[in-house]
Design a protein with these regions (language model features):
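Hydrophobic/aromatic residues within transmembrane alpha-helices of membrane transport systems
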Residues: 24, 36-40, 51, 76-81, ...
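Transmembrane helical elements of multi-pass membrane transporters/channels
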Residues: 17-36, 144, 178, 211-215, ...
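Short alpha-helical transmembrane segments in multi-pass integral membrane proteins
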Residues: 1-19, 76-148, 196-255, 311-377, ...
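N-terminal transmembrane alpha-helices
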Residues: 6-38, 42-43, 59-71, 75, ...
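Short runs within selected transmembrane alpha-helices of multi-pass transporters and secretion channels
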Residues: 69, 145-163, 171-179, 204-220, ...
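Small-residue hotspots at the loop-to-helix junctions and early N-terminal turns
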Residues: 45-56, 138, 142, 205, ...
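Small-residue-rich hydrophobic transmembrane alpha-helices
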Residues: 48-108, 152-171, 283-350, 381-403
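Helix-terminus/linker motif at the lipid-water interface of multi-pass membrane proteins
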Residues: 27, 31-49, 118-132, 188-199, ...
Length: 460
């Protein structure tokens, strides 16, 4: 039993070799967004509400970019496993083209419908002046953030390809540089330090956009200046040719991932909108809770990425089913352990953390209780995340689409919608009930893992 779930030193060296750079990058990114959030929180509850609503909407765009490049990424990891540089070059081109298209479509949607989208979250009980102020701050923030769409999408194209070809340090370095640039500029521009004007939420947006360009310069610059290491980049832009057969394969395997990320993230946005109908205090309280949760979930989410990469490489290299299952079981055990540990830490700081924000006692108290509920659910989230990446690594993208998005829209969203519209249920039981739907997904995920249909080599 002991060796069933616990690996040897070589196993952990391999896992942490892949996971630690991703954890460091995501950890620093989330830690800095926590500091950003606290800085914006010092400006007041109303600007914080506006910014948090916009960030919730931008999350949908970010995950669409991630989903679009992930579909091709399944093939990149397996091409790397079979040492096929030409294959990697084609997947890189696919990512490049689709990420540009998503950036342009996303910018058009937010330019035309930004005001209506933000307004959906400001319908809860509370005074009209608060809602109008939050809308105004949100629109100013959004207008500047749109300038960061293209560099974000291109950075994702380069960074994901480097990670899938075994280079995790440079994306980490680019990410770290970007978050420090963001942090320093935030401090200067939000509060008007060193002779700069005091710009509040607009300063936060300018800092983020500049940091996106810095990250792109580092990651793309390194890729192009190390052509011997990154053979795929040689001639990558000479044409945009992608073989029809591969294009079909990526589209068939990858489209469910893109649609999945869009539906899942937009489902999360709808859930937030349902919660917001319980009162205007819910928006800032949820923002405080999700900021801490995002930092706490870094390790298990990064472990999920590692599960996908390690499983993809093993499947591409043709390992036996027994080996693949054994490694997968141990990876999931590490993931659950991280969820238990960080869930415990979140619960421990649930009372103290909301005290950092310049907001009302009612918002702080509500945030502390929401943090507790999130902390209890974290181990289950970590199991689901590892399961999702396992199924995806073998190309089971349609199954993961059913598992993730269909469940969200068929079950979670209607449940939250009905409870928020047709009952007087307060926010805490409403949030707890919606979170508890993860228990059902855990059962479904376990059945899918045991079936083993995900164990397949896509490169042959």
């Amino acid at each position: 039993m002991h060796h069933h779930y616990i690996g040897d030193k070589a196993f952990y060296r391999r896992v942490f070799g892949v996971a630690v750079p991703i954890i460091i990058q995501n950890g620093i990114t989330n830690f800095v967004s926590l500091l950003d959030n606290i800085m914006v929180g010092q400006v007041g509850t109303v600007p914080m509400s506006g910014v948090s609503i916009v960030n919730g909407l931008l999350f949908v765009f970010n995950l669409c970019v991630f989903g679009a490049s992930s579909g091709a990424g399944i093939f990149t990891a397996q091409f790397y496993g079979s040492k096929d540089d030409e294959g990697i070059r084609h997947t890189f081109r696919f990512k490049f083209l689709i990420c540009i298209v998503i950036s342009l479509v996303g910018a058009a949607i937010f330019l035309l419908g930004g005001s209506s989208l933000i307004g959906l979250y400001l319908t809860g009980e509370g005074d009209a002046a608060t809602a109008a102020g939050a809308l105004d701050h949100g629109l100013k923030y959004l207008a500047i953030m749109l300038w960061g769409f293209l560099p974000f999408a291109l950075t994702n194209t380069y960074s994901s390809t480097l990670r899938e070809t075994g280079e995790t340090f440079i994306p980490m370095l680019g990410g770290i540089a970007a978050v420090f640039v963001n942090l320093v500029l935030n401090y200067i521009l939000i509060f008007g330090k060193f002779g700069a004007p005091e710009m509040g939420v607009e300063g936060a947006a300018i800092a983020t956009v500049i940091s996106r360009y810095v990250e792109l310069a580092i990651v793309a610059g390194w890729t192009h200046s190390h052509k011997a290491r990154n053979a795929f980049i040689v001639g990558a832009y000479r044409s945009m040719y992608i073989p029809g057969k591969l294009l079909r394969s990526i589209t068939i395997k990858g489209m469910p991932l893109l649609v999945n990320e869009f539906l899942w993230s937009s489902g999360m946005a709808v859930l937030s909108q349902c919660y917001s109908t319980c009162g205007l205090d819910v928006v800032p309280a949820m923002n405080i809770c999700s900021t801490l949760f995002n930092l706490g979930s870094v390790v298990y989410l990064s472990m999920g990425n590692s599960v996908g990469i390690i499983m993809g490489q093993m499947l591409g290299a043709g390992h036996s089913e027994e080996d693949v299952r054994d490694t997968n079981r141990k990876l999931i055990a590490v993931s659950i352990a991280s969820g238990v540990m960080f869930g415990g830490l979140m619960a421990a700081v649930s009372e103290a953390f909301p005290g950092i924000y310049n907001t009302t006692d009612a918002v702080r108290h509500l945030a502390a209780q929401l943090i507790w509920i999130s902390a209890v659910m974290m181990p289950f989230g970590s199991y689901l995340n590892a399961t999702y990446f396992t199924l995806r690594s073998g190309g089971q993208t349609f199954v993961t689409f059913l598992f993730d998005s269909c469940f969200m829209w068929v079950f979670c969203v209607p449940l939250a919608f009905c409870l928020s519209r047709f009952t007087n249920l307060p926010i805490l039981p409403l949030y707890a009930i919606c979170q508890a739907t993860d228990f059902i997904k855990c059962v479904i995920g376990t059945v899918m893992l045991k079936q083993g249909k995900w164990i397949q080599n896509l490169t042959v």
